[in-house]
Amino acid sequence: MLTGVGNERTILVYRGASEELKKENIPWDNLQTKWLYIAPLSGELCHVFEDIIDFAVKNKIRIALNPGACQLALPEKVLRRAISKVDILLLNQEEASILTKISYTKEKEIFKRLDEICPGVVIMTKGEKGVTISDGRYLYRVDGVKTKFVDKTGAGDAFGSGFVSGFIQSSGNIEFGIQLAFGNALSCLTKLGAKNGLLKKGEKFVKVKITKEACAQNGLCKCKIC
């Protein structure tokens, strides 16, 4: 890990054997769950991406997807076909811009396009500027939360896992998912390393202010379930 000015960091990773995992290496029969959280895949696993999505759909497993550079570089038809089957899509600004081919400064246009591509909940994180989320009926926003931090490592993953966990625990309550996501991410920021600050079950956490607007209002996003 290389650290720079202002606690910014670059992480150099050697994935080893995980780069070589192929379809035949996955114990499909053991994947018995209600949800799959598909994080960025690389190496040979990137070629198994569609198989994982199709397996989940066939077995009525819900999907949370946080695609990485490898998935976003797949042919557009392949990527869109996969995303059309997911329940929660998590992206940062740059990833959302790559996927939609729209500048991340044009938030309305990005969400209209993302809501066309994905039938589920779409999340776009904006770093220190907060997050915007659409469920096709409402657009939820949280402005950046000022906090003292020790280390940013893992904060994005803490946000994503926190949201999905809260969404599952609350049977699909977006606002609870947002609160748990921010609570987990902000807690992660207070400790060194990616895991040391993660919330434990029942632990209290900081609440944030959520702004909620109807998608039909001012063309904020594409109305999927109005």
Regions of interest found by a model, annotated:
Residues 35-109, 129-131:
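Conserved beta-alpha-beta core of the PfkB/ribokinase-like small-molecule kinase fold
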Residues 26, 79, 149:
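Acidic, amphipathic alpha-helical patches
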Residues 8-11, 35, 62, 88, ...:
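Structural motif
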Residues 15-18, 68-70, 94-95, 145-148:
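Short, acidic/turn-prone active-site loops that include or flank metal/cofactor-
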Residues 72, 104-226:
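Conserved phosphate-binding/catalytic region of the ribokinase-like
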Residues 1-38, 204-215, 219-226:
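Conserved N-terminal subdomain of the carbohydrate kinase-like
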Residues 12, 99, 188:
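Residues that scaffold the ATP/ADP-binding catalytic core of kinase and kinase-like folds
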Residues 31, 77, 84-85, 117, ...:
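Structured loop/turn residues at beta-strand edges in well-structured enzyme cores
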